[in-house]
């Protein structure tokens, strides 16, 4: 084999190895961006539109619920949507931030059961698998009256 051919092949191989991390990072970023969009669309369909048919198409055959006050599985989610539709038809969550880390997406939300209420600061965490929402965690904190706050910062 000729030395020039060997050097050329070695350089091409080195270039491929050097480009691989950038390609993988770009691919991972694209997956995370898609996962964010899935979580946002899911949140809006389930909690803002309260549309079970649309929501059902966005979840997997299993839906693991980590909120201990909510029923596990797709039927539990359906019951929660029906409850919101009946008891809190004006319930609305404004997504303030969306962050993705691999298959996990966190949404920082200002949720109000009705427009005249201060509402809650919520962080919803969703796990996305094969383009479907399959798992959910949340943390909810009531927004205090301004005069009871210990600082002037907002929760959002």
Annotate the PLM regions.
Residues 123-151:
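Short beta-strand edge/turn micro-motifs at domain boundaries
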Residues 107-114:
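Short beta-strand segments that buttress and anchor functional surface loops
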Residues 1-9:
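Bacterial N-terminal signal peptides that target proteins for export
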Residues 8-18:
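Bacterial N-terminal signal peptides
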Residues 55, 59, 100-104, 126-134:
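Short, solvent-exposed coil/turn segments at beta-strand boundaries
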Residues 52-101:
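A solvent-exposed, acidic/Ser-Thr-rich amphipathic alpha-helical stretch
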Residues 19-53, 57, 150-156:
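Short, low-complexity N-terminal intrinsically disordered segments enriched in polar/charged residues
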Residues 91-93, 117-123:
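Short, surface-exposed coil-to-beta transition loops
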């Amino acid at each position: 084999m000729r030395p020039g051919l060997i050097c050329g092949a070695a350089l091409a191989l080195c270039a491929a190895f050097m480009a691989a991390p950038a390609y993988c990072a770009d691919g991972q970023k694209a997956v995370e961006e898609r996962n964010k969009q899935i979580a946002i669309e899911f949140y809006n369909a389930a909690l803002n539109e309260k549309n079970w048919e649309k929501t059902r198409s966005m979840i997997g055959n299993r839906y693991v619920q980590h909120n201990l006050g909510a029923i596990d599985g797709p039927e539990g989610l359906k019951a929660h949507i029906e409850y919101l539709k009946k008891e809190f038809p004006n319930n609305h969550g404004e997504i303030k931030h969306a962050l993705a880390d691999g298959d996990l997406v966190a949404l920082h939300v200002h949720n109000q059961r009705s427009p005249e209420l201060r509402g809650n600061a919520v962080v919803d965490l969703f796990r996305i698998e094969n383009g479907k929402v399959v798992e959910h965690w949340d943390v909810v904190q009531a927004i205090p009256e301004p005069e009871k706050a210990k600082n002037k910062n907002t929760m959002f």
